[in-house]
């Protein structure tokens, strides 16, 4: 969940960029013995985004995502057509899995689900949960911006906090939200193809629409305690480096195998 929201928070800024915008965020775990936070660096300009975290690089431009593997000097291109094909393939695989599980004796099915852990439980679960997004009235600060805290609860238990900045408090807020809607539509079309397992992604987009702003802090909770946090540490006008939104010379495209 945190990873998904970190990416969404980054993309929400991607149009605030006629002069270029630089963002930096720090992600940390409250549970693990973490020496230092994981840093994400993001550059934005004219609806384009470059996001770096270690050796991982993602570029978003012209309604297309590029994931870049710097050690291997390869990249993968993901456009709407690719998302559609991937969604269809995953949906077929899920339907086959459901059919296989339905034909298993209860004891064998329980054993398989236990072996697969929580992921399999999410795939086979059918019960709806009561999800609520509530404005708390509390405020915090991140990267010099005052934000308002919203709580996300599931069946009355807090799962997440998002501290949100109104679009108007940031450069080109209307363009920011328009880019978010366009990218969100691309992913919503993908998850809508899934017979099961797409609820989490749909809920993430729904939560962000409900708060109607840009998260600069997100915290995940388990059993009432925070376990992970992503916090913006820098938001400033800055021209991106030359070639920031280009595929590096000499990199080889890897096709997704469908």
Each model region followed by its residue ranges:
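Positively charged n-region of N-terminal signal peptides that target proteins for export
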Residues: 1-4
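Extended soluble regions of mature proteins
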Residues: 19-258
């Amino acid at each position: 969940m945190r990873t998904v929201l970190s990416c969404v928070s980054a993309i929400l800024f991607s149009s605030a960029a006629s002069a270029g915008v630089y963002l930096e965020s720090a992600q940390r775990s409250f549970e693990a013995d973490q020496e230092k936070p994981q840093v994400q660096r993001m550059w934005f300009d004219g609806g384009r985004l470059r996001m770096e975290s270690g050796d991982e690089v993602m570029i978003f431009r012209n309604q297309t995502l590029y994931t870049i593997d710097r050690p291997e000097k390869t990249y993968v291109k993901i456009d709407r057509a690719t998302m559609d094909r991937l969604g269809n393939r995953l949906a077929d695989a899920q339907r086959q899995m459901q059919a296989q599980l339905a034909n298993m004796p209860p004891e064998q099915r329980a054993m398989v689900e236990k072996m697969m852990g929580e992921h399999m439980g999410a795939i086979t679960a059918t019960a709806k949960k009561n999800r609520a997004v509530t404005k708390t009235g509390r405020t915090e600060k991140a990267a010099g911006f005052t934000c308002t805290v919203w709580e996300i609860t599931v069946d009355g238990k807090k799962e997440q906090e998002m501290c949100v900045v109104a679009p108007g408090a940031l450069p080109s807020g209307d363009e920011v939200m328009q880019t978010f809607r366009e990218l969100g539509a691309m992913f919503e079309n993908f998850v809508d193809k899934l017979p099961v397992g797409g609820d989490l992604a749909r809920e993430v987009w729904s939560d962000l629409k409900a708060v109607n702003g840009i998260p600069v802090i997100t915290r995940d909770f388990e059993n009432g305690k925070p376990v992970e946090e992503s916090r913006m540490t820098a938001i400033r006008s800055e021209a991106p480096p030359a070639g920031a939104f280009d595929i590096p010379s000499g990199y080889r495209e890897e096709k997704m195998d469908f």
